[in-house]
């Protein structure tokens, strides 16, 4: 297993690559490719791992993945068909100097923002409509729709996905280790994980493992693990707060101490879990 230098299939006589995925499991290998990727989650819930960060996703979410950023969309439910639409392109898809044309100068703001990746916040109606429409359009109509989509993305509210911009390629042996680590953590984060268990997955000593992980993600292993657990807790708080207690949610997210869960949650989200639930329901503090 490794960070795969993925080759995006390019249709004959088409510059812009549009891909519709309807399957039980999204492509489940940590991978990177030269293309910038625009992805609309039509129907699925899960976690996006990108660079040094973890982000939950749900129906209607829209993400921009930067060129060569290692990433993985891991959907939760494997018994229900997942659906996403993606567009792939590079800065030279329409010619070496296309995005440098004076008339397209404002699109450079999008290219720059894409390097760290971002999630679109707020109203996504126009973006959603364009992504749903694009697969059925041909040539000029598709191109016009694509340019309008980029313009909408420039003006959209955004949340940066990762502050750690990777070099263009990760070595094969390093990529294999990172893929193995991420796969292990995403599969077992709800259980107890210690350094010995994690480092043994890639046949490293705990000390060497810590240095390796920090070098490749710009954060400690336990920072990454806690962020993954908190993002999972946020998903449960959004979906199941009426059925599960906060203690049950903390336990299902891998925490063995409710006080530690509350402390880590507030550190990352700036509110305690109960207040987070109230905010999601639109309840103002009294």
Kindly label every feature range from the protein language model.
Residues 1-61, 68-69, 260, 285:
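Generic protein-terminus/edge-of-domain signal
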Residues 2-16, 70-131, 155-160:
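A hydrophobic/aromatic-rich effector-binding and dimerization subdomain
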Residues 134, 138-179:
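Hydrophobic, aromatic-enriched interface-forming segments
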Residues 177-184, 229-236:
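Pre-recognition alpha-helix immediately N-terminal to the DNA-recognition helix
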Residues 189-190, 237-242:
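Short amphipathic helical patch at the helix-1/turn junction of helix-turn-helix
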Residues 225-234, 275-286:
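Short, basic, alpha-helical segments at the C-terminal edge of helix-turn-helix-like DNA-binding modules
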